[in-house]
Amino acid sequence: MQWQEDALVLHAAPLGESGAVVTVLSETHGLHRGLLKRQKVTVGDLVRALWTARLPEHLGTWALDVKKKYSASVLRDPLRLQELMLTCELLRRLLTERTPCNDVYDQAMHCLEAIRGPAFTWAKEYLILELFLLSKVGFGLDVRDAVLATEDDPLRYVSPRTGRVVTQSRGQPYHDKLLRLPEFFVNSSAELDTDSLQEGFALTEFFIQL
């Protein structure tokens, strides 16, 4: 049996002298591993992947045709390269193997396309991907109070215990016990600044470490 589609290389574990067990993320087949022989790929490569196996439960083998090397575009920027590696590792660790996740794939590709852009834009897309992944593994934000939000009293805080989002007025009395919600998480046109990005990283990091 076999399947073929575009995929993102997330990890390559050397096996023997000329092989590797390569993990990719594809739109239809999700996180998927296979044996790659006598060929080298790099984490962050977009490939045309052909997976072949005798039975569905087997590891199978890859034939990978590189279409785009995202790492090549950031090789001279160590920080961006590290962020690319971090993105791929995050996907590998949080997703369940062989589970379709076309929405995650689309969001991941959108994130990687932004990696060569302005630093604030890349950071925003990365945080949105983290938040999206958290929702997929059961740690999504509870926004039932969104109907209570107004221009003067926006959604502003997140409970670290339940993930529930509350408005500024409801959360203010407990602000020292709550996580802050950056505006761009609920308003895509919100202005980005260092403070809002720091709030975003503090929020997603808390739940990813749980």
Outline where the language-model segments fall.
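Non-catalytic alpha-helical scaffolds and adjoining flexible linkers that form interface surfaces
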Residues: 1-21, 25-210
